[in-house]
Amino acid sequence: MTFTELCRPIFEQAINDYHKTDNVDAPINNPYPLKSIEYYLYLKNWIDTVQWHFEDIIRDPHIDPAEALVLKRRIDKSNQDRTDLVELIDSYFL
């Protein structure tokens, strides 16, 4: 099995799991063993999926400015979490 073949179903599962609630505040229920590459791949794709929905929310022209600021900070934190996770996943290839 190639790495791509490993990733694809994990990414699809994370997206499908997110869409069970369609809620950026839904808890992550990662089904993979902690600290496994599968766990990190699922988590990364969950963060990506939530991030896409954050971006949709913040583009609402009627968003309250105070809510937008709170969301902007969540987006910034999510971006950093994603960057840290990508670096961790990259370490599997070193």
Annotated model-derived regions:
Residues M1-L94:
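Anionic, Ser/Thr-rich low-complexity intrinsically disordered regions
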